[in-house]
Amino acid sequence: METLHKMKNRTNYQTLGEMLRQLREENNLMQREVGAVIEVDGALISKVENNEKPINREHLKKLSAFFEIDEDMLQLLWLADKIRNIIKDEPLGLKALNYTHTKLNNEH
């Protein structure tokens, strides 16, 4: 299984969709084939790859097993996408994120 450390060294992914597309293309798979793994249609995989629609957390475990990659990396990108989508259009989004980061660091 490819570890989180190895995945970081592979490429610098910005989104889960980008990572999913790269993994699918590296394995010469069609979107519908990846969709079958997580029991969704190929159209949803297309939307995920284009960052138009998210997948559920439950899908990450299946994708991790199928592509033999660390589930933590998938969860990291999945959660980062969720956060980005919440704050991206907010005028104070980045400040709120930085504030939250500081608060979390102080709690631990």
Predicted segments, located by residue:
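A short, Lys/Arg-rich alpha-helix, primarily the initiator
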Residues: 2-26
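Short basic helix-loop element that most often maps to the first helix and adjoining turn
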Residues: 18-34, 62, 96
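Residue-level recognition of specific faces of alpha-helices
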Residues: 19, 44-47, 73
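Short alpha-helical DNA-recognition segment
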Residues: 28-47
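DNA major-groove recognition helix of helix-turn-helix
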Residues: 38, 49, 59, 67, ...
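DNA major-groove recognition helix of helix-turn-helix/homeodomain DNA-binding modules
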Residues: 56-73
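Interfacial/linker helices and their anchor residues that mediate assembly or domain coupling
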Residues: 71, 75-108
